[in-house]
């Protein structure tokens, strides 16, 4: 049985102009060698017969930051508003969008509740802004379950995390 969690998401007030001709599929993954530690992201974009792979990383970061950054980099690669299905094995990423957590954290001044700050507000801010430009469905896929594109993103993210030339993550303390 394939486990998925999917919901279309638009931050409140979003009015992105959509082109129904542009149906894009994005697979993302993030990895960290230690947590925190060197981290990387991997992205596979599919549009018709076109395929693009992206990867990168930072020398000290977290796995969750890399999961969010993978989604950001995938969406930033789109040149115009699209209908997007974004697949991720990160429940943190998918639930934060689909369940409205990220939007709620933003509305509450980047606080999860009265005592706790929301983590990664710099990345959530960027992701929410990108979500407002597209018609996006976030779908959770089980990691390491023989999903070809998810496995490719896993390889890309781990390779990126292992690079010797990684820079500092500007948003990580």
Swiss-Prot record:
Main localization, broad class: cytoplasm
Cofactor(s) listed in the protein's UniProt record: Mg(2+)
Catalyzed reaction equations: Endonucleolytic cleavage to 5'-phosphomonoester
GO terms, biological process: DNA replication, removal of RNA primer
Record's subcellular location: Cytoplasm
Entry GO CC: cytoplasm
Keyword Cytoplasm: yes
Pfam family, one: RNase_H
Lineage top rank: taxon: Bacteria
Residues that coordinate or bind Mg(2+) 2: 29, 154
A molecular function (GO) term: nucleic acid binding
SUPFAM superfamilies associated with the record: Ribonuclease H-like
Cofactor info, note text: Binds 1 Mg(2+) ion per subunit. May bind a second metal ion at a regulatory site, or after substrate binding.
Record EC number: 3.1.26.4
Transmembrane intervals: none
Keywords in alphabetical order: Cytoplasm, Endonuclease, Hydrolase, Magnesium, Metal-binding, Nuclease
Residue ranges occupied by any RNase H type-1 domain in the UniProt entry: 20-162
InterPro entries: RNase_H, RNaseH-like_sf, RNaseH_domain, RNaseH_sf, RNaseHI
Annotated positions binding Mg(2+) 1: 29, 67, 89
Annotated segments matching region Disordered: 1-20
Function of the molecule: Endonuclease that specifically degrades the RNA of RNA-DNA hybrids.
Family: Belongs to the RNase H family.
Assembly behavior: Monomer.
HAMAP family in the record: RNase_H
Protein name: Ribonuclease H
Organism per entry: Syntrophus aciditrophicus (strain SB)
């Amino acid at each position: 049985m394939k486990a998925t969690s999917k919901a279309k998401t638009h931050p409140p007030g979003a009015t992105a102009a959509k082109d129904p001709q542009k149906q894009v599929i994005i697979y993302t993954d993030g990895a960290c060698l230690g947590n925190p530690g060197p981290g990387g992201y991997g992205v596979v974009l599919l549009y018709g017969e076109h395929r693009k792979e992206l990867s990168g990383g930072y020398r000290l970061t977290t796995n969750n930051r890399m999961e969010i950054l993978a989604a950001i980099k995938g969406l930033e690669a789109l040149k115009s508003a699209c209908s997007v299905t974004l697949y991720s094995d990160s429940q943190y990423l998918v639930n934060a969008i689909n369940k409205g957590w990220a939007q709620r954290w933003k509305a509450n001044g980047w606080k999860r509740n009265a005592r706790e700050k929301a983590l990664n507000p710099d990345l959530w801010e960027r992701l929410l802004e990108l979500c407002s430009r597209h018609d996006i469905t976030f779908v959770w896929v089980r990691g390491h379950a023989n999903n070809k594109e998810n496995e490719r993103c896993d390889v890309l993210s781990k390779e990126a995390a292992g690079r010797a030339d990684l820079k500092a993550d500007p948003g990580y303390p």
